C-alpha cells in the first residue's frame, strides 16, 4: 500500500492547502505590473481628462489633503454634465477593479518578501506578516468607500450631502496614507531582500 507523505504542520498554512512556493515571484511580478498599468491608465487617462475639464482642479481620488463641501461642489460644477457622466464611466468603472487588484498584488508581494529566508534567517512572525498585509487591505477598503461616496455625490447632484463629502474626504486622506505606507514597507523589504541576495552571491 502506497501512502502519501504527510506535510508537517505550518502555522502559516494551517490547512496545508498552499503550494510550498505560493506565491511565486513570477505571479507577484505579474500582479504588480497589472496593478501599475491600471493605475497609469486611470491617472493619465480619465483623471487627467477630468482635471482638464475642471480647468486644472485635482479629482477627488488624488487629493492627499482631502476636500471640503465647497471644494467638492466647485469641482463637480466645474466639470459640467459631461464630466460628471465621464467620472461615473469610465473612471469609476476602471476604479472598481483597482482596489482588489491593489490589495492582492501588494498583499502577496509583502507575503512573498517575508517568506522564510528572504529578509533574514529567522522566520518573520505570522502576526507581523498578517499586520503587513492588513495595510494594503485597508487602503483598498478605503478606496471602495471613497468610490461609493463619489457615486452618491454624482447621483445626488446638484444636491450634495455634507456628511457624504466628509466621509469621502476622510477616506481619500487615509487611503493615500495607507497606500504610501504600503509602498514604503514593500520597498524597504525589497531592499533588504536584494542586499541579502547580493551578499550571498558575493560570499558564497
Residue ranges with predicted function:
Residues 17-27, 80-90, 121-131, 160-174:
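Membrane-interfacial loop-to-transmembrane-helix junctions in polytopic alpha-helical membrane proteins
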Residues 133-188:
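Alpha-helical transmembrane segments of multi-pass integral membrane proteins
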Amino acid at each position: 500500500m502506497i501512502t502519501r507523505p504527510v506535510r508537517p504542520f505550518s502555522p502559516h498554512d494551517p490547512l496545508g492547502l498552499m503550494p510550498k512556493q505560493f506565491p511565486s515571484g513570477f505571479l507577484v511580478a505579474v500582479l504588480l505590473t497589472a496593478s501599475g498599468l491600471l493605475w497609469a491608465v486611470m491617472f493619465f487617462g480619465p483623471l487627467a481628462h477630468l482635471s482638464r475639464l475642471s480647468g486644472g482642479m485635482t479629482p477627488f481620488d488624488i487629493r492627499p489633503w482631502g476636500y471640503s463641501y465647497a471644494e467638492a461642489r466647485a469641482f463637480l460644477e466645474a466639470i459640467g454634465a459631461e464630466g460628471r457622466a465621464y467620472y461615473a464611466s469610465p473612471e469609476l468603472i476602471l476604479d472598481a477593479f483597482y482596489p482588489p487588484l491593489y490589495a492582492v498584488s501588494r498583499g502577496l508581494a509583502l507575503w512573498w518578501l517575508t517568506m522564510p529566508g528572504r529578509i533574514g534567517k529567522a522566520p518573520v512572525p505570522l502576526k507581523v506578516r498578517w499586520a503587513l498585509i492588513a495595510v494594503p487591505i485597508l487602503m483598498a477598503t478605503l478606496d471602495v468607500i471613497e468610490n461609493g461616496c463619489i457615486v452618491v455625490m454624482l447621483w445626488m447632484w446638484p444636491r450634495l450631502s455634507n456628511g457624504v463629502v466628509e466621509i469621502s474626504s476622510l477616506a481619500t486622506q487615509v487611503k493615500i496614507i495607507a497606500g504610501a505606507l504600503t509602498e514604503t514597507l514593500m520597498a524597504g523589504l525589497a531592499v533588504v531582500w536584494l542586499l541579502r541576495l547580493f551578499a550571498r552571491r558575493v560570499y558564497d
